[in-house]
């Protein structure tokens, strides 16, 4: 298997381009908290073999790499989409909004935007390429996944201080047994996604 950096470099050669961006999201499947999307254009000579899918890294390593990526990119953009917005748009449309916004807001217009996943995204004057399991294949996407994950985890850690009974620090808003039990016991919060089936079910049971 070729390295993530080689994957990106080959794409640059094949497409004869200079600026390549990578985009990924964090928190799309969560029951609580925002959806976070990040896009990044890295310096061409930057590489760190430790960088991979953010979910495969421990929190301390992710934070160190987050700081390193910020220092070694030409530009990056992060958008935080609230749980209310996710409910209003639906998770897919919220993700698409995040990808479009962060890519369009980059100070340097990428010649090609690599996006994690298989959903077709069309941008005006910017070519896009969807990469399934992109955070495992592309260095740029892996870097964007770290930016998104670290940003989102910090928000959930803050929620943990505000709502200590829900243990957001451990499950980060995902649908775990402990999280569901806390919702049943202490109630549905404003930061919960009311359109998600587990939340709908608890809402019906407690109404």
Swiss-Prot record:
A divalent metal cation binds at residues 24-25, 116. Its EC number is 3.1.26.4. It is an enzyme of class 3 (hydrolase). Pfam families: RNase_HII. InterPro entries: RNase_HII, RNase_HII/HIII, RNase_HII/HIII_dom, RNaseH-like_sf, RNaseH_sf. Its cofactor is Mn(2+); Mg(2+). Keywords: Cytoplasm, Endonuclease, Hydrolase, Manganese, Metal-binding, Nuclease. PROSITE patterns: RNASE_H_2. It comes from the Bacteria. SUPFAM superfamilies: Ribonuclease H-like. It catalyses: Endonucleolytic cleavage to 5'-phosphomonoester. Manganese or magnesium. Binds 1 divalent metal ion per monomer in the absence of substrate. May bind a second metal ion after substrate binding. GO terms for cellular component: cytoplasm; ribonuclease H2 complex. It is found in: Cytoplasm. The keyword DNA-binding does not apply. GO terms for molecular function: manganese ion binding; RNA binding; RNA-DNA hybrid ribonuclease activity. One of its GO terms (biological process) is DNA replication, removal of RNA primer. Residues 18-207 form the RNase H type-2 domain. Belongs to the RNase HII family. Endonuclease that specifically degrades the RNA of RNA-DNA hybrids. This is Ribonuclease HII. It comes from Mycoplasma mycoides subsp. mycoides SC (strain CCUG 32753 / NCTC 10114 / PG1). The gene is rnhB.
